Amino acid sequence: AGTNLPSHCDMNKTIGIDMTAGSLGQGLSCAVGMALAGKIDKKDYKVFCILGDGESQEGQVWEALMYAGNMRLDNLVIFIDNNKMQIDGMTDDINSIEPLDEKAKAFNLHTQRINGHDVEAIEQALQNAFDTKDKTSLIVLDTIKGYGVDWVSSKGAGCHSMSITEAQWREFCGKEDV
């Protein structure tokens, strides 16, 4: 029962997820380890890590970013979903991580900041990451939580862990039988 897109990515439910992590930032440290192993073993693969801005307040994330920059892991692409919200409220009100792109550049990361709702911008940022040699890539995705669904995005931080009813789902999909 439930969704294959739970609030925390689950490798047992979501295709393409190789490791389950959570809100404490361990996922990036593991991604750095996977990318480093690929370099040591001379394997030709990319490692992708998706973080939220709330979990990016964790010290472990900053240690992993610094290490990735120092190791020049050009086979690692990190996305940070910068929707400016976390479970307890607005990220800036709790513990601001801005200016995120400037901090990442100081760690020797190839850093891009884009509209996270623009698919073409994401594709271009990925191509730029693939073309970058000797630097880990970090892509900051500026997003709006609930983008495109007014009755969700208007809730602000209150939509962080909200559930929707079956009736809301049907209304959103515009179908009686979903």
Where are these regions (language model features)?
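Cofactor-binding active-site loop characterized by glycine-rich and histidine/acidic residues
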Residues: A1-N70
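Acidic, glycine-rich active-site loops and adjacent beta-strand->loop/helix elements
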Residues: G2-N4, L51-E58, N82-M85, H117-V119, ...
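Histidine/lysine/aspartate-rich catalytic loop segments that bind and position anionic ligands
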Residues: M71-I94, E98-A104
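Generic beta-sheet signal
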Residues: Y45-C49, L76, K135-T143
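Short acidic, glycine/serine/threonine-rich loops at helix termini
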Residues: D10, Q60-W62, D88-D92, V149-S154
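A short alpha/beta connector and helix-capping loop motif
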Residues: E58-N83, L138-L141
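Glycine/aspartate-rich loop-and-adjacent alpha/beta segment that forms the canonical ThDP
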Residues: V119-V178
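Conserved thiamine diphosphate
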Residues: K42-Y45, D92-A125, K175
